[in-house]
Amino acid sequence: MEIERVWGVQGIGITARLRWRLFIPIQVRGVTVTWTTRAIGETGTRYMSARPDEEVTPIKSILYGVDLVPGDSVVVHEGPTDCWATGPGAVGVFGLNVSPTQVAEIGSYGRRTICFDDGKDAQKRAERLAERVSVLPGETNVIRLESGSDPAEADPEEIAELRKLCL
């Protein structure tokens, strides 16, 4: 399975705190520095992440998928499932709130395309992120998908076009 092979995702069985979730390691330079989990079903808390005492690096100070960026272009998404849909070159910021450290990391790439979910709040925050990043050298764009509410639900042909144009 590509998600397991490329992104290192694993399943969690019946543990007390993280029952029936996908375990998503977050790596920087090949080292897992923190993690998050995603509920398998649609009930319960969608994402649960490492507590501060369980992580080497705070989750909001890094970008998900940064080790898989092949060049100087990134597509910025909210979270891991969107990154999986887009593939290597996509990075995630773990939600709609983007830290100054994440802004600087995004700005270190010459070409940044921000692609958040199609909700009104998400689109507003994508525009705000673009404003923050665009003061840094390079090209910054915001794109809104036409075929789905987010990359994980979008038409694979549209995702292929996104990759072709932006990565």
Each PLM stretch: what is its role?
Residues 1-12, 25, 29-32, 74-76, ...:
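Replication-associated primase and helicase/ATPase modules
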Residues 2-111, 125-126:
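Phosphate-handling DNA/RNA-contact segment within nucleic-acid enzymes
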